[in-house]
């Protein structure tokens, strides 16, 4: 058993979402080890929680192949720096938070030298490039997974994994407050709204804005009182969306919001959104949704051959059934999108019953992954530190 009251705990986050997770974990670990020291690569929230950072986390926050290639020399230099620092400092444990392309190599080197390692947030190995599970096994003492089907995947390969629940499920109420969301967005609660989320990446907005806007035009003809909420992550995406809208739907009135996706989905009767975290957030907001996704033809051709799952959206993966429509590539056209959304907007008894049943399933799935993830993650770290990893829940 470890008797050290002030362990040295190392953490590396590579983007904003990881910084949020890291800060929550640090604060939860302080309850176990008030005198612990935290070092690594941290963003502003982790630094505020007390983590010393080797360099600015933003240096690791690159997305897309072109960006990675452009910054590869710097990324490799920073990875070497992290490995050398950790080998010199000899932390009691190293926790790589997401950023698997960076962290798994660090973890593998450190584990080989006798340092305990945890990878926090499972890469999507269950969906594609499943052979990565062998590298994960070599690199980690334990994987912390947000979702139960991720743990089931690791169990098949005898890789230690603990399901801790999803932090997002801890931050959203089981019964979201629509009135509060409308007030927060300065919206009239008596109006009808549809939330349209075209994704956070430039490529997603480029592919999805046009079919999503054209679907909105069709719905506006059928439901003249329907209004559209379009939350976008930053000014660049807003400008990109407005440029596309000016070409394909100049006369359509929409409420463009900077951020506030969660409030928009709570305020709206239904959501049209890109696959990804937004679909999980929509489920937790109890928003009936249609998932649409388009990509380059070659990317789609490759994805069809590489992706190993029946579904692409997290609500369907969690439920292991087609709870919400998934319209991919050619099926992601305005007519299809509008037809499926119409099922959520129709006001007859049958459609109301279907909507209520869907929201009930969303609530059940919310409860499944609402486990106080920060506390669960901290307990897992304590167990590995104290070498009590036999019970992986």
UniProtKB/Swiss-Prot annotation:
Catalytic activity: a lipid X + a UDP-2-N,3-O-bis[(3R)-3-hydroxyacyl]-alpha-D-glucosamine = a lipid A disaccharide + UDP + H(+)
Key words of the record: Glycosyltransferase, Lipid A biosynthesis, Lipid biosynthesis, Lipid metabolism, Transferase
Claim: Iron is one of the keywords in the record: no
GO cellular component: membrane
Pathway linked to the protein: Bacterial outer membrane biogenesis; LPS lipid A biosynthesis
Pfam family, one: LpxB
BP terms from Gene Ontology: lipid A biosynthetic process
EC identifiers of the protein: 2.4.1.182
A molecular function GO annotation: lipid-A-disaccharide synthase activity
Matches recorded under CDD domains: Glycosyltransferase_GTB-type
Function according to Swiss-Prot or TrEMBL: Condensation of UDP-2,3-diacylglucosamine and 2,3-diacylglucosamine-1-phosphate to form lipid A disaccharide, a precursor of lipid A, a phosphorylated glycolipid that anchors the lipopolysaccharide to the outer membrane of the cell.
Family under the similarity heading: Belongs to the LpxB family.
PANTHER family: LIPID-A-DISACCHARIDE SYNTHASE, LIPID-A-DISACCHARIDE SYNTHASE, MITOCHONDRIAL-RELATED
Name assigned to this protein: Lipid-A-disaccharide synthase
Primary gene name: lpxB
């Amino acid at each position: 058993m470890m008797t050290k009251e002030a362990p040295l705990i190392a953490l590396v986050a590579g983007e904003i979402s990881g910084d949020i997770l890291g800060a929550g974990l640090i604060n939860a670990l302080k309850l176990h080890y008030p005198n612990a020291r935290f070092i690594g690569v941290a963003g502003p929230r982790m630094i505020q929680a007390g983590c010393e950072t080797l360099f600015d986390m933003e240096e690791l926050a690159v997305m897309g192949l072109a960006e990675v290639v452009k910054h590869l020399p710097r990324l490799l230099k920073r990875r070497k720096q992290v490995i050398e620092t950790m080998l010199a400092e000899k932390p009691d444990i190293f926790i790589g938070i997401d950023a698997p392309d960076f962290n798994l190599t660090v973890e593998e080197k450190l584990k080989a030298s006798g340092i305990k390692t945890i990878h926090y947030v499972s890469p999507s190995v269950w969906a594609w490039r499943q052979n990565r599970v062998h590298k994960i096994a070599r690199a980690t003492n334990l994987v912390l997974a947000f979702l139960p089907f991720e743990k089931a995947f690791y169990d098949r390969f005898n890789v230690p994994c603990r399901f801790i629940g999803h932090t997002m499920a801890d931050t959203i109420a089981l019964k979201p407050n629509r009135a509060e969301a409308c007030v927060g967005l300065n919206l009239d609660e008596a109006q009808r709204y549809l939330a349209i989320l075209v994704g956070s990446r430039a490529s997603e907005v480029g592919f999805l804005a046009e079919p999503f806007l054209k679907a909105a035009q069709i719905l506006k003809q059928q439901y003249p009182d329907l209004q559209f909420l379009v939350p976008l992550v930053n000014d660049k995406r807003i400008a990109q969306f407005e440029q596309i809208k000016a070409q394909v739907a100049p006369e359509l009135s929409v409420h463009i919001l900077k951020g506030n996706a969660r409030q928009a989905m709570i305020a709206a009767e239904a959501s049209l959104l890109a696959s990804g975290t937004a679909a999980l957030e929509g489920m937790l907001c109890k928003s009936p949704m249609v998932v649409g996704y388009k990509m380059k033809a070659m990317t789609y051709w490759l994805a069809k051959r590489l992706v190993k799952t029946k579904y692409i959206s997290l609500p369907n993966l969690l439920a292991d059934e087609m709870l919400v429509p998934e319209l991919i590539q050619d099926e992601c056209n305005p007519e299809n999108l509008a037809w499926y959304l119409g099922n959520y907007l129709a006001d007859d008894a049958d459609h109301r019953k279907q909507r209520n049943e869907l929201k009930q399933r969303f609530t059940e799935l919310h409860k499944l992954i609402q486990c106080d993830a920060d506390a669960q993650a901290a307990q897992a770290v304590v167990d590995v530190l104290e070498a009590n990893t036999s019970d992986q829940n």
